[in-house]
Amino acid sequence: MSADQRVLVVGAGGLSSPVVRLLAERDIAQLTIVDDDVVDESNLHRQTLYTDADVGYSKIERAKIAVEAIRRGISVRTVEGRFLPETAMSLLRGHTMVIEGADNLATKFLVADAAHIAGVPAVQAGAVRWAGWAFCALPGSACLRCLFEDIPADRIETCAEAGVVGPVVGVLGALQAAIAFRLLEGERPRGELWHYDGLRGALRRTLVRRRGDCPLCNGEIQDLRVERYTAPCAA
């Protein structure tokens, strides 16, 4: 694995907690973490990167401290703010891949679109209650829109509202890290979709094919218009 790899992590919550911990142990050139939230006591059961002592502090500030405690000398860049249409392309620039762990569909689709346009691999995931998914999109392979098409017109519950079992988030975050490691090692897991059912303890892999009518894959989406990502959603 080349030591000049640079990884962008969008979100520093439950999904990203195992991702950040595991990436901190790898020989990468830089880890960039983007988030605009503070550590909340009610989320500690799934945001395992933090402890009681971190409550009330900026997530990216405490995430950087945690990473540097795991591996001294690692370059950690923190960006306090959201991954937005007007900043997405500049944040992606120079990175080997993006790993997304946000808690809203608008950000998930924005990351997918921006990564596709920039030609950057994207590793994404989501979890609600006892189940979740992890997905890997590479340039030329199926994208998130091939899988979910678009942000639903009707508001849907996020994990913060519907609830999520902490270990389920941990499993999905670890899956993201595993996919990222494979990418860093030179593998190309095109269109891999992993489903995890925590109630049954079942993990299943399927391969997603590109849809002929996918607006992102067929080039209809070539920019990041704000109105594309303004469906009702929680932060």
What positions do the PLM features span?
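Adenine nucleotide-associated cytosolic modules
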Residues: 1-235
